[in-house]
Amino acid sequence: LPEHTEESLLKQLMQELEEAAAAVSVQIMGGHTEITRVVNQPLVTVCGVGKVKKNGLISTGGAKPGMDIIATKWIGLEGTAIIAHEKEEELCTHFSRHFVEQAQALDRYLSVMPEAATAVKSGVGAMHDVTEGGIFGALWEMSEASGVGLEIDLKKIPIRQETIEICEFFNLNPYQLISSGSMLIGTDHGSQLVDALAKEGIHAAVIGKAVEGNDRVIFNDGEKRFLEPPKADELYRACLLYT
């Protein structure tokens, strides 16, 4: 915590951590808190430990050629919510306050546990949460881990209008923006899984396929480009350019 932090904020953080852990039946085993001048806002790091049955592990590297690639919810959720909170007043000079509040509220979608549970029941080959580096980074990581190529339709990648407009305002690439809340899934039955997720109230879309070889190709209205290795997340650029 930064210097001059009020004790009430620490109590609030502890309560939020307890509530979040209880919601997913996780125990908090310990922790450490300190005041330091090297941060200018609260910083929380978490190390999670879990276990899974050997035959129940679904990894990033399980995609096979021919599998459909699904993206759940929408990309850029976390990055959009963070920017909307941190740059609220600046955004309100260009957008309505209602729009900014809608963007801030996207953080309610950050858990991927609901879609993971549905995917496991449906039977899938690979799962990978989309975090730093955005959807482009996650696609590269899944392809690299699985030893497959990709053919992805950019237009099919689900994205919210709030993310599009905020990224345009700050000249950011939404496809390289931290996207916690979205998950990549490799499955032989893409349409059926999308339908199963929809029944649970979870938006999802088939965005492409895993293919033989190493080429990771993005198609956009007939144009073809090759996916590049993950770059620094656009959120960091936003923080550097607009503080």
Residue ranges and their predicted role:
Residues 1-241:
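Helix-biased detector of long, well-ordered alpha-helical tracts
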